[in-house]
């Protein structure tokens, strides 16, 4: 007489598959660094913008978390800035990067290859223009309200958000956070 009950292995496999599906539903899509009100910022975009920013400025200490935070802030500030009259074109961003490269002593025109790097520059320009304006306080208050009301999900690989919504870089207890390795003399 054959048993109609599933074997222990099949039950275990089904339970593991169900648990995997449940966990997958709780995490960001693969390759996603963050989503802001449904708009995805991919890990590739963060990596490209970080690399291009380091190449432009020479600042080796710029982290993907800082770039991701800026891209998220830019996603929130841009529509508010445009409405307040602080729209910035791609050409203006490229000119800004050229000026930054020149000020840093670069002899070559900086490569602006990614849309995310343009978005990073757009945020920096808009922020600086708004900061210098008489209506800065009102615009930044509106941006802060937008941030508090936004649906922001951050891949835990990059950061977590604290109660104020600020990004806190993820630190893994099992990864030693010691001094960086010395660079070879050369």
Predicted segments — roles?
Residues 12, 32, 67, 128-129:
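Residues at structural and domain junctions
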Residues 1-62, 148-186:
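Short, low-structural-confidence N-terminal segments
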Residues 28-117:
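N-terminal targeting/tethering segments
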Residues 98, 105-186:
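PPIase-associated folding chaperone regions across multiple families
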Residues 21-25, 80, 129:
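Hydrophobic membrane-targeting alpha-helices
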């Amino acid at each position: 007489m054959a048993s109609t009950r599933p074997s222990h292995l099949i039950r275990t496999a089904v339970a593991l598959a169900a648990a995997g599906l449940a966990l997958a539903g709780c995490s960001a899509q693969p390759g996603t660094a963050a989503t802001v009100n449904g708009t995805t910022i991919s890990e590739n975009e963060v990596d490209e913008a970080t690399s291009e920013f380091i190449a432009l400025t020479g600042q080796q200490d710029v982290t993907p978390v800082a770039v991701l935070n800026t891209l998220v802030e830019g996603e929130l500030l841009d529509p508010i800035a445009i409405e307040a009259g602080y729209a910035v074109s791609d050409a203006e961003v490229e000119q800004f990067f050229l000026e930054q490269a020149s000020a840093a002593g670069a002899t070559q025109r900086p490569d602006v290859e990614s849309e995310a790097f343009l978005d990073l520059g757009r945020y920096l320009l808009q922020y600086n223009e708004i900061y210098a304006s008489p209506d800065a306080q009102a615009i930044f208050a509106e941006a802060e309200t937008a941030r508090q009301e936004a649906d922001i999900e951050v891949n835990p690989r990059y950061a977590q958000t604290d109660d104020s919504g600020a990004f806190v870089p993820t630190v893994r207890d099992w990864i030693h956070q010691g001094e960086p390795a010395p660079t070879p003399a050369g």
